[in-house]
Amino acid sequence: MTKLRHIIPLLFLALSLACAAQTLDTDALAEYPAAIQRQVFEVAQYAKLTGEQQRTLAEAIKKENKIFADAVKANGGALIVKSRNKLNKSREATLASILDREQLEQYYRGVYDAEADAEGNRVADMLQKKYNLTDQNWKFIRVAFYKAALESKVIRKVMADSPKKAEKRIAEVRAEQMRSIEEKGGLRVNPDMTITWLREFDPNKLHR
């Protein structure tokens, strides 16, 4: 129950961000079939797009769907790995050409949120079981690893053309999140997933 109280605020935050972006311009997309509108919504549910952006995306999806249909037909009804990878790269390039940096980050945060959430819970549960951590420290670890995992995935996508810079930024984000655990919980999570205790947990430190 205590863990649930820690998770609920994050769920409301994620829900509020998602609701803020879930806007489909039905007038701008009126000429497109429902299947294409749905594919546009799969992007617009995470990143708020203008009507013009949605139309541009719809046109790109229309072309992608034609490529998809041709690829499946050419391979006897199957989509081979090479064609799938080509389509995925095409979609990523399309999004990068239509969305600005902030929109791309919003989109990929939405895409990878559940995966990052699972990673945060996995690490926190593992360390709590191993070290008999308090629920407060479970929360600090869970949030830090969730944020680190989420931002790492987003950075690798939006900085795909600069992998060295991306990895440097990821290292900075991870270090920042690990420091948050130390500052709030008085413990350090080491790279080998062991814990070093720095001080006793002080709830008053949370309010400084």
Describe the predicted segments one by one.
Residues 1-27:
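Bacterial Sec-dependent N-terminal signal peptides
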Residues 22-208:
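Charge-rich (acidic/polar
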